[in-house]
Amino acid sequence: MVIAVYPGTFDPFTRGHEDLVRRASNIFDELVVGVAQSPNKRPFFALEERIHIAREVLGHYPNVRVEGFSGLLKDFVRKNNARVIVRGLRAVSDFEYEFQMAGMNRYLLPDVETMFLTPSDQYQFISGTFVREIAQLGGDVSKFVFPSVERWLVEKVGRRHAESDKTA
């Protein structure tokens, strides 16, 4: 049984993320989507919200489970007995960072491989950062995220706008 881990911040979980999960779940016996705490990135959604959102989107995949983690990826990979780390590459700009991370992961986990998947054409330009910016500026994100994720975004953006109106 080959277990793979697909780690990320998933802030928010996009159609591009789901595309990679769908494809990776067809390759591996079990896929663990690891939602990283990532405090240095100052996520828009709290860790528990991101886990909940990912579970809403991915609940219909029988061989996929979603777990949150903090700390080193190597510890999460070991905890889940994974033999592969799945990473997405959208563009050449992603490659340099991901290549360095794969090298470090190989050093820390010599018996674990990193597998890169490129997104389907319609998802190559989607990033969580772009989706958050569009949502915060009142734009339509429905083509980039699932309806449940869009509802979370609209609610969160509305709360933040209401809070900033109170302080202004």
Curated annotation (Swiss-Prot):
| GO-annotated biological processes | coenzyme A biosynthetic process
User: What cofactor does its activity depend on?
Assistant: Mg(2+)
Enzymatic class: transferase
Alphabetized Pfam families for the sequence: CTP_transf_like
Q: Which HAMAP family match?
A: PPAT_bact
Q: Which PANTHER family match?
A: PHOSPHOPANTETHEINE ADENYLYLTRANSFERASE
**What is the protein named?**
Phosphopantetheine adenylyltransferase
- Which source organism does the UniProt entry give? Ralstonia nicotianae (strain ATCC BAA-1114 / GMI1000) (Ralstonia solanacearum)
Phylogenetic placement of the source organism: Bacteria, Pseudomonadati, Pseudomonadota, Betaproteobacteria, Burkholderiales
Q: Which gene encodes it?
A: coaD
